[in-house]
């Protein structure tokens, strides 16, 4: 909408003159920032990490380690296996920490419906990565509406069944995100359909209380064995969202210089690591390491990132990945 209404400046010339670190950070991906073949303008620097390899994943569904332990750490690969583990655990442990056990909880009263209702339906029913409300058939080079795809009806039938059975949180459609996080922090929600960045603070709270078994394992759950989990699928740089400069900006040169500093080694280290001697140090091999104190505090203090600034303002700015 901003581009269609001519609200953003084309940063191409400014980057050519003032953005060497921007070009260095994006490298071979730089040309992918251009809007289209018809309009090669660069309206935004994407918020996706550049050269990011998937090393760890929260899977398509999550399950408490306590439930996995109860099942001899057997991994559920299908919805039926996943549901049965939760069902059996709820029967055996109807309460956790003196509160009613919740089988699966999601929060759909605000934008989180997208990450907990829409996205999992594509992951689990179709083995499709997050492409918005669309499924991309790379072989046929076709795009079609996700919720009309094969498997979607069966996925929502499953949600309906576990709701009627009492496994799905009855407040899933009306509870606030804060309510949802509080339930997770109580340690009584067995399964999630979410991403770890969303419930991370609740896990920090659980660990600080010595309830590591109530944190979550990311699992490759799909609707049946014919569907392949998409969580480890490598994808190209996502350029659909990011940070741009509006035409009302009084000093676009200064704005680009700031973005260029963000992309510099100095800026990237400060945003991601903090201050040398306080949050990190260099070992005898010249490798940057987080201090033991910060490592321990980051595991138990839900305000660590906000308090120290480490990792707090990485998004929505450009950032190096882990490659």
Where are these regions (language model features)?
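Extracytoplasmic/secretory soluble proteins
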Residues: 1-323
């Amino acid at each position: 909408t901003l581009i269609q209404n001519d609200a953003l400046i084309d940063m191409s010339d400014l980057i050519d003159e003032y953005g060497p670190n921007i070009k260095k950070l994006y490298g071979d991906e730089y040309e992918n920032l251009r809007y289209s073949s018809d309009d090669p303008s660069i309206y935004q620097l994407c918020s996706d990490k550049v050269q990011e390899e998937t090393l760890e994943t929260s899977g398509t569904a999550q399950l408490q380690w306590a439930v996995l332990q109860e099942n001899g750490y057997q991994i559920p690969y299908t919805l039926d296996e996943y549901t049965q583990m939760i069902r059996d655990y709820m029967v055996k442990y109807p309460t956790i920490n003196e509160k009613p056990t919740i089988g699966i909880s999601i929060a759909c009263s605000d934008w989180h419906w997208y990450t907990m209702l829409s996205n999992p339906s594509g992951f689990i029913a179709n083995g499709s990565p997050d492409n918005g409300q669309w499924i991309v058939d790379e072989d046929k080079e076709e795009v079609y509406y996700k919720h009309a795809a094969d498997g979607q009806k069966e996925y929502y039938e499953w949600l309906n069944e576990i709701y009627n059975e009492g496994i799905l949180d009855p407040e899933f459609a009306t509870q606030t995100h804060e309510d949802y996080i509080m339930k997770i922090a109580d340690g009584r929600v067995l399964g999630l359909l979410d991403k770890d960045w969303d419930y991370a603070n609740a896990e920090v709270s659980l660990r600080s209380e010595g309830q590591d078994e109530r944190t979550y394992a990311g699992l490759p759950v799909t609707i049946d064995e014919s569907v392949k989990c998409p969580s480890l699928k490598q994808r190209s740089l996502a350029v659909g969202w990011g940070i741009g400069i509006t035409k009302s900006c009084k000093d676009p040169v200064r704005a680009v210089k700031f973005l260029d500093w963000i992309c510099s080694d100095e800026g990237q280290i400060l945003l991601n690591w903090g201050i040398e001697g306080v949050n990190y140090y260099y070992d005898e091999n010249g490798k940057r390491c987080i201090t033991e104190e910060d490592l321990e505090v980051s595991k138990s203090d839900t305000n660590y990132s906000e308090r120290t600034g480490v990792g707090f303002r990485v998004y929505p700015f450009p950032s190096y990945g882990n490659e």
